[in-house]
Amino acid sequence: MKVYSSIKKRCEHCRIIKRKGKRYVICKVNPSHKQRQG
């Protein structure tokens, strides 16, 4: 999981979700697209 100050969807399968006040990008098709904002 990579940490960025601004997160973006890297493919059409990526989803942006909020958990515990943090924003995450989750991608089941390509797990290397996982990101966290902070």
From Swiss-Prot:
GO cellular component: ribonucleoprotein complex; ribosome
Gene Ontology molecular function, alphabetical: structural constituent of ribosome
PROSITE patterns listed in its UniProt record: RIBOSOMAL_L36
Keyword line: Ribonucleoprotein, Ribosomal protein
Family annotation (SUPFAM superfamilies): Ribosomal protein L36
Membrane-traversing stretches: none
KW Ribonucleoprotein (keyword) present: yes
Pfam families attached to this UniProt entry: Ribosomal_L36
InterPro entries the record matches: Ribosomal_bL36, Ribosomal_bL36_sp, Ribosomal_LSU_bL36
Gene Ontology terms: biological process: translation
Family per similarity comment: Belongs to the bacterial ribosomal protein bL36 family.
Protein name: Large ribosomal subunit protein bL36
Record organism: Chlorobaculum parvum (strain DSM 263 / NCIMB 8327)
Lineage of origin: Bacteria, Pseudomonadati, Chlorobiota, Chlorobiia, Chlorobiales
